[in-house]
């Protein structure tokens, strides 16, 4: 279990094509889907993220770390870590990596319960997965902090 930092957080469900973003506050115990960053170059994606950072003024980031169900590294594990380090480098905010196993399954389940299907489902799935990642972090699940220094 980790100490939950105070203040606003932005959470990310990183993918090469789409990055789901959620926003929340641990003190309030609330999180919600926010946006999906799509397409373009890395610079364009980070410009979109910079707008969200400007708007929401987070104190830290939470990034889902994909691993296989048995806990071994996934093909995307390295890319998600790289993304988190870039967030830290650009915005000078701590990054917490959390196990994102089953976040997409959870998001699919929530969207099915809400009867969200088709194009609408695809447009919000990554955001809801980011919300699930943030919710897990707020609930005290295991996390690893990166603050600009490799340990």
Curated annotation (Swiss-Prot):
InterPro entries: RNaseH-like_sf (IPR012337), YqgF (IPR005227), YqgF/RNaseH-like_dom (IPR006641), YqgF/RNaseH-like_dom_sf (IPR037027). Keywords: Cytoplasm, Hydrolase, Nuclease, Ribosome biogenesis. The keyword Nuclease applies. Gene3D superfamilies: YqgF/RNase H-like domain. It is found in: Cytoplasm. Its main location: cytoplasm. It is an enzyme of class 3 (hydrolase). GO terms for cellular component: cytoplasm. One of its GO terms (molecular function) is nuclease activity. Its EC number is 3.1.-.-. GO terms for biological process: rRNA 5'-end processing. It comes from the Bacteria. NCBIfam families: RNAse_H_YqgF (TIGR00250). Could be a nuclease involved in processing of the 5'-end of pre-16S rRNA. Belongs to the YqgF nuclease family. This is Putative pre-16S rRNA nuclease. It comes from Neisseria meningitidis serogroup B (strain ATCC BAA-335 / MC58).
């Amino acid at each position: 279990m980790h100490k939950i930092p105070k203040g606003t957080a932005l959470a990310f469900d990183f993918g090469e094509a789409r990055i789901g973003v959620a926003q929340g506050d641990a003190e309030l115990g609330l999180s919600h889907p926010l946006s999906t960053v799509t397409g373009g170059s890395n610079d364009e994606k980070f410009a979109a993220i910079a707008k969200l950072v400007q708007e929401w003024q987070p104190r830290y980031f939470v990034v889902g770390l994909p691993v296989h169900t048995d806990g071994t590294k996934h093909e995307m594990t390295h890319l998600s870590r790289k993304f988190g380090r870039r967030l830290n480098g650009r915005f000078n905010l701590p990054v917490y990596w959390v196990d994102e196993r089953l976040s997409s399954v959870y998001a699919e389940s929530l969207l099915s319960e809400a009867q969200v299907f088709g194009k609408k489902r695809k447009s919000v799935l990554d955001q809801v997965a980011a919300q699930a990642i943030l919710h897990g972090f707020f609930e005290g699940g295991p996390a690893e902090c990166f603050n600009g220094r490799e340990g």
